[in-house]
């Protein structure tokens, strides 16, 4: 389930079951041509054929029905969608309440929101507690390393992709996995290291399920050899492995690539999670303001909080009147927090205001 589509696996299993049934039917028809006298109940067809099938069916049902197995299946399915960049499927599968209970699902959901451009609109519904919700700075686990490879790939840092893929491979049982190999092949093709990519393709071709995928990658290599060598345009260092924080790393990326909206959104949302509103307002004015026709939801919410201390900020940024009315209602309820605590969470639990004042 980790490396292949579940639907394809089910079709293979169903095909083998059908072959087994055909063999049984053929042997049963041949037996009927010869009279066989059954003298003992142990030789009954029920015990010889139906009972084993029933036992296998019950065993499979009990295995599939176990909660921990369903959780593993969901994790593998989500990782498969992340690798294929099926962001909408990821968000449809991960509910906000699930993300609050599972850090891995929370990371996946926030990455998917970033990719569809809605991180600054819906982030707080998924319960982030800090910038650690964006990236695993201290990797501990195979799927966390897989997440980091996807994170680097989404930011366009293929050097980071290769490093994390090797880290993931070392945590597998055999020192390498199909997932890591596929990641290394794609990253090296983008980097222009076609010889290295071909080496990994030779390893992967010995598997049973990657023939068509390998052909597609070899076609990319052939096409690339006819074009000018392409090198990834970003070389982001190993995030959060030294003394620098996630926000500082994103600030460095934005400084080098001011047109990178994904890194800019991560920077702004990271400042919101750190509750550093003065720097948020500065970065928004210096970098992001010229890119936006309208302010995203969480940016408006943050600016209204800044405006309480620095009213002149609201003269620079235009905030929707409806949002201003919502903030006034929230703040009036906040003054009576003990009385309206449950209403604050139910009405504003997915807002920056609730995160800033109540967590």
Predicted regions and their residues:
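Surface-exposed polar/charged interaction patches
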Residues: 207, 274, 290, 305-309, ...
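Short, compositionally biased small/polar motifs
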Residues: 247, 251-252
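Terminal, low-structured helical/coil segments at or just beyond the last alpha-helical repeat
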Residues: 253, 312-359
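Intrinsically disordered, low-complexity segments enriched in Gly and acidic/Ser/Thr residues
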Residues: 276-322
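Membrane-embedded alpha-helical segments of integral membrane proteins
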Residues: 1-35
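Extended alpha-helical scaffold regions
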Residues: 28-41, 45-48, 159-160, 188, ...
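Soluble catalytic regions of membrane-associated enzymes that act on cell-envelope
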Residues: 64-239, 243, 254-274
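Internal/C-terminal transmembrane anchor helices
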Residues: 40-69
